[in-house]
Amino acid sequence: MATASLDALQAAYVDFSEITLREKVGHGSYGVVCKAVWRDKLVAVKEFFASAEQKDIEKEVKQLSRVKHPNIIALHGISSYQQATYLIMEFAEGGSLHNFLHGKVKPAYSLAHAMSWARQCAEGLAYLHAMTPKPLIHRDVKPLNLLLTNKGRNLKICDFGTVADKSTMMTNNRGSAAWMAPEVFEGSKYTEKCDIFSWAIVLWEVLSRKQPFKGIDNAYTIQWKIYKGERPPLLTTCPKRIEDLMTACWKTVPEDRPSMQYIVGVMHEIVKDYTGADKALEYTFVNQQIVTKESDGTVAAQPDSLSSQEGELSPSSTQLTPTTAANANVNAIAISKTTTSSMTENTSSTSSDITPTNSGQLDNNPLFYMVTNRWDAIPEEESNESRNDSFNLTSSAEATQRLETIRNGMILMACKPMEQLTLDVEANGFDLSPSESSSSSTNAKSDGRERLTVTDTKPVMMTTDLSNNNGGIHAHSNGLLSHANGWQARDEELQEQEHEQEIVNSLDVDVDPDEDENDGTEQSLAEILDPELQPEPPIPNDAESQLIYRDHRHMAKEYLSVDTNLYYAQDFKDKLIVQMDRTEREQKQELLRKMKDKEGLQSLYNNLQQQYASRQLAAGHHPQPHPHPHPNQLQHPHSHPPMHFLQDEGCGLLPGSVCGGSESVEEGWVVIPPHHNA
């Protein structure tokens, strides 16, 4: 079999000159994924970094060469160029299911589509588990590795960098924490049942359109919660048949979970009750950005401008009620236009489309209520992803245009000739003794500050040659200039404070906010900001309001300056990263990942110590002080949780944990008692 696979790979070798690379569309476990053209058809080209181990490349190629299924991404060929390896794979124009569900723009979809995606994912996994002679385990099933094609109607599994042969009982941890089965990160031996657990979390995600454990950033905290039996909250009014299947698949004991073949059979029966999965979803996935427009011109999903209304939406407005085949097609998604130009005109119609039925329950009730039979567009949620990720969703057109306006304005200001800096120097000032200088004027100071008149305090280089005036002037002019700038700045600051205090004391004085030394520069810069950040117009004839308005304008100017500096710093950083050697870049990224894992372990350890101390105090025992471990003594990120915490009299350490094998609900999480092998 290995020889046959090697021969197939040799036959599938592609000359790199036949490939025309286009924009990057994402990244996988070991490399970048680019859109490309090969033999007059669109393909996805996965580039493996030079530092990637050859065995990882060979593993993915070997596994893909064995796979041929409509719900699994196909491998067309392999190529190499400049010490980099490229895999030519099937292109999924719809992007990942994760971006579809949780991206900036959230296209609408029906319950029929959700059930169809879950069924197709189950069929692809069942195919892997049933392969001969060596079945395969994916080990990293999550929406990021599920791609949409055919306008959202078809789903395909990708990223086989974690696939393993089922013939070997695997013990190394792979996958993401929120979708990872407890036996995987626990360190126990696991089988294909870990994919079934991950599939159940994906099913919950497409039903709720929420990210599991979204509010928890620490991966080890998520693993600890899953180990203790916590699961995502059950969906109210969810069909019992779907709920029973979902809860059976995420059971703690792997042997209690059904097989993927059984899941496929159940899903085939479920999808019969929901028609409409063959309806195309009108959206386009371009450069990690989803663009949705209906044929009648209405936008099928709310853009970023509705993010401010997020607090007004309750779970009731974002969930669905199962429908029968008779009425599943009746409730089509229709959302009014929400473009920037028509936002004001359509406020009433838009509000009527998204008004929740139980407003205000988002923060008070942990459960998600499903009271509508369709997916409405959901405003963008607050993202936890790093803004330094070069594969994040691109900025909106308005933000890009605003940034270009700022840059162009700064360039014009930099090119504008500035007034020449001049110094008025007393003719015989440097020839006078200190006593003569002090007696020359009753108002003169000993430092000679009154002898200098600075007409401009901007940091402009002094280029005027004053050597012809006096031999000592040229030597001391730079120092005098710097002191003069400092004095002038302090005087201006004191004068401005005194002036503002006088205005506050006399409320009858009108202050014109535009009468400032910036000649309207701050006003024009403030108008570049987003509407929610722009200064509110002041109250007429109110001195305090005028001062607040002026302060806001100053802060807006500072904000734009800082934001622009951040942009240039990020651009400079990106250029340095591109110029950096790939091996060095990978080493630095690996170091950053290890540092983050170290911080996560330290945080988890401190949390467990606090819980242990609280339990000891509650039981009337005085906890023994434990020396704080050295960071290097912390457990490896992939090791299972410390057993001296896990086996504390059979009870959980988290508040509200379950003892004695009973089930309870704590803070909206379904708690399942952990399983301990005899």
UniProtKB/Swiss-Prot annotation:
Gene3D superfamilies: Phosphorylase Kinase, domain 1, Transferase(Phosphotransferase) domain 1. ATP binds at V25, G26, H27, G28, S29, Y30, G31, V32, V33, K46. Its cofactor is Mg(2+). Keywords: ATP-binding, Immunity, Innate immunity, Kinase, Magnesium, Metal-binding, Nucleotide-binding, Serine/threonine-protein kinase, Transferase. One of its GO terms (biological process) is compound eye development. Residues 19-271 form the Protein kinase domain. Residues 353-364 have a biased composition (Polar residues). SUPFAM superfamilies: Protein kinase-like (PK-like) (SSF56112). Component of a protein kinase signal transduction cascade. Mediator of TGF-beta signal transduction. Responsible for activation of the JNK MAPK pathway (basket, bsk and hemipterous, hep) in response to LPS. Component of the NF-kappa-B pathway; relish-mediated JNK inhibition involves proteasomal degradation of Tak1; certain targets of Relish that are induced during immune responses may facilitate destruction of Tak1 and switch off the JNK cascade. Participates in diverse roles such as control of cell shape and regulation of apoptosis. This is Mitogen-activated protein kinase kinase kinase 7. It comes from Drosophila melanogaster.
